[in-house]
A protein has these predicted regions:
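Asp-based, Mg2+/Mn2+-dependent phosphohydrolase catalytic module
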Residues: 1-10, 107, 121, 125-254
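Proline-centered loop/turn at the N-terminus of a beta-strand
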Residues: 112-114, 194
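N-terminal helical cap/lid subdomain that shapes the substrate entry/recognition surface
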Residues: 7-17, 22-101, 107-108, 122
Length: 254
């Protein structure tokens, strides 16, 4: 787990940020590259046809939150080998896309920031560096950090989040999960945390051609925004500001 000094101490909200399609547009070029690498890995290791491997990759992502967990459970693959092979990054200047002024937007959010990603550290940290936002994150929790003695874990695993909240001393009422993946928001909101659904980086269709939902605001989403800029604006005025203030009062009743 990578740590940096907190910029805001222990007061105020705590933001648990997803990485891909939340802080940058992974669907532009990085996700297609990773998806191809994952499918090729499955073809090579399991000896299945390309189409079957592609369906397996998508199915495990939907069922377990990460392809890795399905491959471990059903095929006993080497997790470290898998993560190393399928998360090789090209030159980031060629593929990285993010909001203009993202460093200023992240820095301007009140409270602590923790990265919570199902990606490995050797992938996540260079992206944070390239975006110029690594120093704004007090913790960077990768999929390796989510594992325990019993099993590898990934969002939306309940045991993983429960241990993270305890380890970091986070009050659920003032903890906000910022995600593009609705299923993660839905499952983890049961802990009493608040949820932000960010939709601006979502592709129109997923890798199998299915339309990605982005309309409406499900009951388990507290704030829906298209961008970090919109999130900042909603926290300055309006309903977003009221929700953050209400969460702070709930966690500090005195």
């Amino acid at each position: 787990m990578h740590r940096a000094r907190s910029e805001h101490g222990t007061r105020g909200p705590v933001w648990l940020f997803d990485l891909d399609n939340t802080l940058h547009r992974a669907s532009h070029a990085i996700f297609p590259r990773i998806n191809r690498a994952m499918t090729a890995y499955i073809v090579e290791k399991l000896g299945v046809a390309h189409d079957e491997a592609n369906l397996m990759r998508a199915s495990y992502t939907e069922r377990y939150g990460a392809v890795l967990l399905g491959l471990i459970r059903h095929h006993a693959i080497d997790p470290h080998e898998f993560l190393a092979q399928v998360h090789e990054l090209p030159p980031l200047a060629d593929v990285l896309r993010a909001e203009r002024g993202i460093a200023r937007l992240v820095a301007g959010l009140p409270g602590r920031k923790i990265l919570l990603t199902n990606a490995p550290a050797h992938y996540a940290m260079p992206i944070l560096e390239a975006l110029g936002i690594r120093r704004h994150f007090e913790r960077c929790v990768s999929i390796e950090d989510m594992a325990d003695r019993r099993a590898w874990r990934a969002k939306p695993d309940a045991t993983m989040l429960r241990r993270l909240l305890v380890r970091e001393g986070l009050a659920p009422a003032r903890t906000w999960l910022v995600e593009d993946t609705r299923s993660h928001l839905k499952h983890l909101r049961h802990f009493g945390i608040k949820t932000v659904w960010i939709t601006g980086h979502l592709p129109i269709r997923n890798s199998l051609g299915k339309v990605m939902p982005r309309s409406g605001r499900p009951h388990y989403v507290d704030i829906k925004v298209q961008s970090l800029r919109e999130l900042r604006a909603s926290l300055a005025t309006g309903e977003g500001a009221k929700r953050v203030a209400r969460a702070a009062r709930q966690s500090n009743p005195n």
